[in-house]
């Protein structure tokens, strides 16, 4: 009988610790020390939330930088079932897969070796918010033409916003870069 009582007490204590106190402590630490990150790293522009630093968006206008292709078409709507309800993830297709090759040809004119790898392939999550600085610099002439500014001005904007990669190439956040373009004075 004593063993059963000890087992029940240990179960209740473990449930309170792991199911209530630990999550409460982690939530408080997150809200106090990492408020921005714990709440989705949201970006506000013109007094409205326009996106998150952590989630890529689909950009199509020529006056904006375009992010990486998305294997899930930037689907973040759980009601829109895409690929059996998956709203994030890579394609898991091999290099020889005909669908992958067709998609890459769609994003890149076949035979054009002047395209960065991140402009032609999706990320592992399918929602990557960053592109390489090299990719951004290759898009700069198109954006400069669309906005009637010099390419060097757009390139300076890219260099000012670049983030250093540790084991990767330098990169920029596409949403932050596009907001900076909109804020740019003529």
Curated annotation (Swiss-Prot):
Any GO BP: potassium ion transmembrane transport
Transmembrane annotation, as ranges: 10-30
InterPro entries for the chain: KdpC
GO MF: ATP binding; P-type potassium transmembrane transporter activity
Keywords, ordered alphabetically: ATP-binding, Cell membrane, Ion transport, Membrane, Nucleotide-binding, Potassium, Potassium transport, Transmembrane, Transmembrane helix, Transport
Cell compartment(s), UniProt: Cell membrane
Signal peptide range in chain numbering: none
Domain of life from the UniProt record: Bacteria
GO cellular component: plasma membrane
Membrane disposition: Single-pass membrane protein
Subunit structure: The system is composed of three essential subunits: KdpA, KdpB and KdpC.
Protein family membership: Belongs to the KdpC family.
Protein role: Part of the high-affinity ATP-driven potassium transport (or Kdp) system, which catalyzes the hydrolysis of ATP coupled with the electrogenic transport of potassium into the cytoplasm. This subunit acts as a catalytic chaperone that increases the ATP-binding affinity of the ATP-hydrolyzing subunit KdpB by the formation of a transient KdpB/KdpC/ATP ternary complex.
Name of protein: Potassium-transporting ATPase KdpC subunit
């Amino acid at each position: 009988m004593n063993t059963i009582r000890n087992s029940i007490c240990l179960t209740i204590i473990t449930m309170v610790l792991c199911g209530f106190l630990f999550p409460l402590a982690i939530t408080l630490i997150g809200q106090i020390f990492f408020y921005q990150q714990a709440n989705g790293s949201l970006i506000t522009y013109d007094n409205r939330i326009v996106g998150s630093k952590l989630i890529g968006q689909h950009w199509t206008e020529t006056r904006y930088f375009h992010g990486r292709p998305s294997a899930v078409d930037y689907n973040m709507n759980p009601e829109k079932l895409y690929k059996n309800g998956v709203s994030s993830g890579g394609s898991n297709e091999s290099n020889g897969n005909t669908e992958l090759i067709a998609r890459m040809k769609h994003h890149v004119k076949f035979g054009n070796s002047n395209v960065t790898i991140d402009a032609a392939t999706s990320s592992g999550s399918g929602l990557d918010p960053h592109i390489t600085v090299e990719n951004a610099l290759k898009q700069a002439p198109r954006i400069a033409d669309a906005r009637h500014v010099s390419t060097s001005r757009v390139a300076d904007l890219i260099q000012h916003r670049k983030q250093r990669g540790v084991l990767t190439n330098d990169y920029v956040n596409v949403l932050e870069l596009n907001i900076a373009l909109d804020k740019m004075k003529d």
